[in-house]
Curated annotation (Swiss-Prot):
Pathway: Carbohydrate biosynthesis; gluconeogenesis; Carbohydrate degradation; glycolysis; D-glyceraldehyde 3-phosphate and glycerone phosphate from D-glucose: step 2/4. CDD domains: SIS_PGI_1, SIS_PGI_2. Its main location: cytoplasm. This is Glucose-6-phosphate isomerase. NCBIfam families: PRK00179.1. One of its GO terms (molecular function) is monosaccharide binding. Coiled coil: none annotated. The active site is at 355 (proton donor), 386, 514. It comes from Aeromonas salmonicida (strain A449). It catalyses: alpha-D-glucose 6-phosphate = beta-D-fructose 6-phosphate. GO terms for cellular component: cytosol. The gene is pgi. The lineage of its organism: Bacteria, Pseudomonadati, Pseudomonadota, Gammaproteobacteria, Aeromonadales. Keywords: Cytoplasm, Gluconeogenesis, Glycolysis, Isomerase. It is found in: Cytoplasm.
Length: 549
């Protein structure tokens, strides 16, 4: 990867001039000028995902300049470097090869001169065998009963991805009851233990190092609870499995290392659902559906690696997002899935994007002179319409939005889905074109009101419009489609980080708080007043000590 400051490129300067010259661009005018705008500014991927980006504040010239920026910052070399296993996570000296985890071809993928695919496929085969035993009931617990409950204990990438995907694929779910524990708050594990019984529960402890504080605290609590009921530590081996690389620690915990499923240091946490960390997904929906998830991601990988920038879905989404972030001054993006099964999708990419691109130091080690990662947030529709859409429609902040929806529902009850999609289609139209003062007045007149009666109310019912959106419509939410959608957003994040000249695959920002927490924890176990911090932190700790005494 070349370390190029994007603001110093000719394309960036051209984009600044282009923005200044087109600040008054109106979507209403762009559509009026070009009846074929939808055809020009939409793409279909794989025949079952439509990406309509026509309701954006862009012209063909805008896209040309954005593509020029990608070329001038040498995006191609960054893409090739990732797929070729180069150590593009330079601050940790690691390759970034989540694409290898879903490589469904015979193509070798090398890391440090070694093809990683034999090991990847061996772990997948081991996962498949384990899943089949658990799902079929062949695997028995310590009393001879089959497993009915699976509790995944992890945090961050070891939790958010499996939770989001198992929720999204609930229509494909088997009889196993899935539970997820992540928070070190004892309430999370306590409430989960109330829902299960020891005889029929399998615990998955998901920690690469088997030292993650939150995960191991919860795992030890679960183990102690289990042993107290089972009466014999030896029974742990039948009820606990590890998703880890630390065989010594796994064995010391009491887990049979035959039931340890490894992954590698080139797998980043927020990109790990494709690895052994995806075990709860495979257990929930079956291994065939897990493989379909991988297949969808693989097909998006191949599209991303080979399509021209002008026809490349992740690249176009990244460039359009960059246009708003760096030239329009937008500080956030909303992800709005009109599918209840996808209710954790925004939270998943909140981590995926903000942990990847929330950086203020460039790849040369210097402070950046431009904006980097946006704030990502969102909720499912139509709930969000009754919560925060007011600000998107009539607030003072520009918030580009991605709307996602399936054409076909897994639950075609009455007219629920047509009503849902009517709102999906209506929102992007309303955001783009708004409602003028003249339209508002005409509505009042049609309702029998005089303008004198309503003139004070008219300004409040005007919608400026010109609020940009992408519409991502897919035929149905299948494992394969979900895999493609996840990979699409992953690559969007990568493209933006590459152009911004930052490292997207480390996360040093999570470390300082953990270090200070490790320093503070022993102080909480003494009765003495604390004086070792600033006056605010001292005051908070000492108040806590007084209140808990």
């Amino acid at each position: 990867m070349k370390n190029i400051n994007p603001t110093q490129t000719q394309a960036w300067q051209a984009l600044e001039a282009h923005f200044a010259a087109n600040k008054e661009t109106r979507l209403k005018d762009l559509f009026a000028q070009d009846p074929k705008r939808f055809d020009k500014f939409s793409l279909t991927f794989g025949g079952d995902i439509l990406v309509d980006y026509s309701k954006n504040l862009i012209t063909e010239e805008t896209l040309k300049l954005l593509v020029d920026l990608a070329k001038e910052t040498d995006l191609r070399s960054a893409i090739d470097a990732m797929f070729n296993g180069e150590k593009i996570n330079m601050t940790e000296g690691r390759s970034v090869l989540h694409v290898a985890l879903r490589n469904r071809s015979d193509r070798p993928i090398e890391c440090d001169g070694k093809d990683v695919m034999p090991e990847v496929n061996a772990v997948l085969a081991k996962m498949k065998g384990f899943c089949e035993k658990i799902i079929s009931g062949e695997w028995k617990g310590y009393t001879g009963k089959a497993i009915q409950h699976v509790v995944n204990i992890g945090i961050g990438g070891s939790d958010l991805g499996p939770v989001m995907i198992t929720e999204a694929l609930r229509p494909y779910k088997n009889h196993l009851q899935m539970h997820f524990v992540s928070n070190v708050d004892g309430t999370h594990i306590a409430e989960t233990l109330k829902e299960i019984d020891a005889e029929t529960t399998l615990f998955l402890v998901a920690s690469k190092t088997f030292t993650t504080q939150e995960t191991m605290t919860n795992a030890l609590t679960a183990r102690d609870w289990f042993i107290k009921i089972a009466g014999d530590k030896a029974h742990v081996a039948k009820h606990f499995a590890a998703l880890s690389t630390n065989g010594k620690a796994v064995a010391e915990f009491g887990i049979d290392t035959d039931n340890m499923f490894e992954f590698w240091d080139w797998v980043g946490g927020r990109y790990s659902s494709w690895s052994a960390i995806g075990m709860p997904i495979a257990l929930s929906v079956g291994f065939d559906n897990f493989e379909a998830l991988l297949q969808g991601a693989f097909e998006m990988d191949m599209h991303f690696a080979t399509a021209s920038y002008e026809q490349n879905v992740p690249v176009l989404l990244a460039l359009i997002g960059l246009w708003y972030n760096n030239f329009h001054g937008a500080e956030s993006e909303a992800i709005l899935p009109y599918d209840q099964y996808m209710h954790r999708f925004p939270a998943y990419f909140q981590q995926g994007n903000m942990e990847s691109n929330g950086k203020y130091v460039d790849r040369n080690g210097n402070p950046v002179d431009h904006q980097t990662g946006p704030i990502i947030w969102g909720e499912p529709g139509t709930n969000g319409q009754h919560a925060f859409y007011q600000l998107i429609h009539q607030g003072t902040k520009l918030i580009p939005c991605d709307f996602l929806a399936p054409a076909i529902s897994h639950n075609p009850i009455g007219d629920h889905h047509p009503k849902l999609l009517a709102n999906f289609f209506a929102q992007t139209e309303a955001l783009a074109f708004g409602k003028s003062k003249e339209q508002v007045e005409a509505e009042f007149l049609a309702a029998g009101k005089t303008l004198e009666q309503v003139e004070d109310l008219v300004p409040f019912k005007v919608f400026e419009g010109n609020r940009p959106t992408n519409s991502i419509l897919f035929k149905s939410l299948t494992p394969k489609t979900l895999g493609a959608l996840i990979a699409m957003y992953e690559h969007k994040i990568f493209v933006q980080g590459a152009i911004w000249n930052i490292f997207s695959f480390d996360q040093w920002g999570v470390e300082l708080g953990k270090q200070l927490a490790n320093k503070i924890l022993p102080e909480l176990n003494t009765a003495e007043a604390v004086t070792s911090h600033d006056c605010s932190t001292n005051g908070l700790i000492n108040t806590w000590k007084a209140w808990k005494a």
